């Protein structure tokens, strides 16, 4: 439904632009993140968990920590920052002629890479072991990240990569 609605919006915008000579542009925005991201999105879930557990991790109170549970660690996403995407939207509207644009970084990173970056930033490197639903992230001999099949999407898209050339 989400993709179908996006496709409908794309074509109705294009149709109005051509039929009524409207200044109407499509901005096709790939994943963009900020502190305002919804709590159920994976990036927010990861950063929130890290923030909530940082002091316990530093104090090595692992028994008080419930592991971070995630779905597909091999999902590749083209993640950018919302502030950059808002600037891109403004620039799209400054063009002399209306057109359609892709707003993306042009590179992908896995969920696993995102988790690793967060833990590295906290000064707590992870070691990974296992594969698939048996994969875990371990810090100081303690499991702090677990893959949980309940977080796998029923129709997961393996790779989302945008071409920002226009």
Which role does the model predict for each range below?
Residues 1-25, 47-56:
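Active-site Tyr-X1-5-Lys
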Residues 28-33:
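Proline-glycine-enriched beta-turn/loop adjacent to the NAD(P) cofactor-binding site
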Residues 37-166:
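C-terminal substrate-binding subdomain of Rossmann-fold SDR/epimerase-dehydratase oxidoreductases
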């Amino acid at each position: 439904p989400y993709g179908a609605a996006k496709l409908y919006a794309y074509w109705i915008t294009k149709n109005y632009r051509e039929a009524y000579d409207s200044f109407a542009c499509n901005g096709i925005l790939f994943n963009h993140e900020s502190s305002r991201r919804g709590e159920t999105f994976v990036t927010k879930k990861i950063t929130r968990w890290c923030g909530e557990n940082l002091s316990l991790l530093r104090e090595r109170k692992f028994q008080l920590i419930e592991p971070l549970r995630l779905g597909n660690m091999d999902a590749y996403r083209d993640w950018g920052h919302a502030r950059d995407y808002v600037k891109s939207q403004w620039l799209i509207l400054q063009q002399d002629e209306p057109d359609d644009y892709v707003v993306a970084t042009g590179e992908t990173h896995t969920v696993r890479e995102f988790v690793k970056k967060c833990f590295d930033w906290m000064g707590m490197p992870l070691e990974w072991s296992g594969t698939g639903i048996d994969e875990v992230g371990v810090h100081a001999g303690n499991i702090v990240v677990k893959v949980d099949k309940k977080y796998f999407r029923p129709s997961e898209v393996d790779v989302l990569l945008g071409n920002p050339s226009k």
